[in-house]
From Swiss-Prot:
Residues 458-502 have a biased composition (Low complexity). Residues 454-477 are annotated as: Linker. Residues 458-503 are annotated as: Disordered. InterPro entries: CBD_sf, Cellulose-bd_dom_fun, ConA-like_dom_sf, Glyco_hydro_7, Glyco_hydro_7_sf. GO terms for biological process: cellulose catabolic process. It catalyses: Hydrolysis of (1->4)-beta-D-glucosidic linkages in cellulose and cellotetraose, releasing cellobiose from the non-reducing ends of the chains. It comes from Penicillium janthinellum (Penicillium vitale). Residues 501-537 form the CBM1 domain. This is Exoglucanase 1. Glycans are attached at residues 136, 414, 456. GO terms for cellular component: extracellular region. PROSITE patterns: CBM1_1, CBM1_2. The lineage of its organism: Eukaryota, Fungi, Dikarya, Ascomycota, Pezizomycotina.
Length: 537
């Protein structure tokens, strides 16, 4: 389940792109230039990874919104200026968004690493942030993940209860919606076009217009509110986590790409009818603690959150190709040079350690949850979003809708200790966002070493009884683009400690057209996943 995405900023909101006349449009301001911090990532093949030079942009809900004729705020606290913004159309013409002041948000990058700080105070106070990976200054990077894997390193050691360092994909437009909605002149350069499976209604602008009509300020969030419109699209939550709990969760939608909804028909966190929309707001989540494995993840546990680790997510298809139907989502971890598989569920009636349609149906039945996942297309529905190509989101937030209890505590709060699926972590149910903000202002998350490529191409590691050595050589290659540099990194890994010959643990060992090894090093067994893919497990 995914909670509210009500990210906070204490004095500001959205401005959008410039037109030179008074027609309705999202305007671009001129008070602060928009610049994008550099962030590298890697594309991998079976034997090498190519480093790609990208950058990140902060979501357009963060920068201050002011009048096009001066510096008067269009949005202060959680309220629109009634003169500048009497309605959606007029507000879009009167107001503009400038570049984000990253020194105020204290979002920092270094090489392939991104750090997001929780509470920051400069000229104004900011809570959390949401960023997108860019291909170039005006286009989001799109990822096609079917029959691929996605890997990144994360440090959650400074994320306590009540916080969510979320890394995920959404099916938003690569240009931020500029082509579809000509009144949006800001686009991806300024972080516009966000959508997710909650169909968020707290966005200040959607589809080139303001979200003023029907705006109701939040009662418990001094920076946010809810408008008449929401922005929907398929969402693949690779990682929602703090140092106590984590979850991987696909959320399909009837229409995978970005669409605008109205009022209660949006469903999700922001509507009285949670299941009244066209997306699955709950998703099908694999949280190890919720699945009965309470000693797998956390400080000092199998995955020790006191230290950084690698997260690997694989997207298998029914025919082993990038054009097939999504059939399974697998999860691995690497920590201390050791590959660690996702734990097996211990819930009665729910077996396995990966997400499939049958696993999701069994989990929904065991927990008594509404099966919106199946209703909105299940794995095939999620795969349709992945086939579109999705934008990478990296964020840190707290939850003014349900206090993040759905991730790391007991939810619903009136559940008993024997209620199936209610226990999601060890955190207390009594905390509130304002307490989290005042108690842990220095919390932060670090994402780094992002890689994508064919299955088993982005990570290496042994087991407790094996050791490995890695030799890496690099060379730079020129490109025709002045904005992008590609570096080829060739990695050779030699392992010892496992007896016999064959494919290493977790590697491919069979499938239609497979020409590599068909046996596994001891003690692993070549296990068939489908006709096109077998793996050493």
């Amino acid at each position: 389940m995914k909670g509210s995405i009500s990210y906070q900023i204490y004095k500001g909101a959205l401005l959008l792109s410039a037109l030179l006349n008074s027609v309705s449009a999202q305007q671009v301001g001129t008070l602060t230039a928009e610049t994008h911090p550099a962030l590298t990532w890697s594309k991998c093949t079976a034997g090498x990874c190519s480093q790609v030079s990208g950058s990140v942009v902060i979501d357009a809900n963060w920068p201050x919104v002011h009048s096009t004729s001066g510096s008067t705020n269009c949005y202060t606290g959680n309220t629109w200026d009634a003169t500048l913004c009497p309605d959606d159309v007029t507000c879009a013409a009167n107001c503009a968004v400038d570049g984000a002041r990253r020194q105020h948000l204290r979002v920092t990058t270094s090489g392939n690493s991104l750090r997001i700080n929780f509470v920051t105070t400069a000229s104004q106070k900011n809570i959390g942030s949401r960023l997108y990976l860019l291909e170039n200054d005006t286009t989001y990077q799109k990822f096609n993940l079917l029959n691929q894997e996605f890997t990144f390193d994360v440090d959650v050691s400074n994320l306590p209860c009540g916080l969510n360092g979320a890394l995920y994909f959404v099916d938003m437009d690569a240009d931020g919606g500029m082509a579809k909605y000509p009144t949006n002149k800001a686009g991806a350069k300024y972080g516009t076009g966000y959508c997710d499976s909650q169909c968020p209604r707290d966005l200040k602008f959607i589809n080139g217009q303001a979200n003023v009509d029907g705006w109701t300020p939040s009662k418990n969030d001094v920076n946010s509110g809810i408008g008449n419109h929401g922005s929907c699209c398929a969402e693949m939550d690779i990682w929602e986590a703090n140092s106590i709990s984590n979850a991987v969760t696909p959320h399909p939608c009837d229409t995978p790409s970005q669409t605008m909804c109205t009022g209660q028909r949006c469903g999700g966190t922001y509507s009285t009818d949670r299941y009244g929309g066209t997306c699955d707001p709950d998703g099908c989540d694999f949280n190890p603690y919720r699945m009965g494995v309470t000693n797998f993840y956390g400080p000092g546990e199998t995955i020790d959150t006191k230290s950084p680790f690698t997260v690997v997510t694989q997207f298998l298809t029914n025919d082993g190709t990038s054009t097939g139907t999504l059939s399974e989502i697998k999860r691995f971890y690497v920590q201390g040079g050791k590959v660690i598989g996702n734990p097996q569920s211990t819930i009665v009636g729910v077996s396995g350690n990966s997400i499939t349609d049958s696993w999701c149906n069994a989990q929904k039945s065991a927990f008594g949850d509404t099966n919106e996942f199946s209703k909105h297309g299940g794995m095939a529905g999620m795969g349709a979003g992945l086939a579109d190509g999705m934008v990478l989101v990296m964020s840190l937030w707290d939850d003014h809708a349900s206090d993040m209890l759905w991730l790391d505590s007991t939810y619903p709060t009136n559940a008993t200790s024997t209620t199936p699926g209610a226990k999601r972590g060890t955190c207390d149910i009594s905390r509130r966002p304002n307490t989290v903000e005042s108690t842990y202002p220095n919390a932060y998350v670090i994402y780094s070493n992002i890689k994508t490529g064919p299955l088993n191409s982005t990570f290496t590691g042994g087991t407790t009884s094996s050791s490995s050595t890695t030799t890496t050589t690099s060379k730079s290659t020129s490109t025709s683009s002045s904005s992008k540099t590609t570096t080829t990194v060739t990695t050779t890994t030699t392992s010892s400690g496992s007896s016999g010959t064959g494919a290493r643990d977790w590697a491919q060992c069979g499938g239609n057209g497979w020409t590599g090894p068909t046996t596994c090093v001891s003690p692993y067994t070549c296990t068939k996943q489908n006709d096109w893919y077998s793996q050493c497990l």
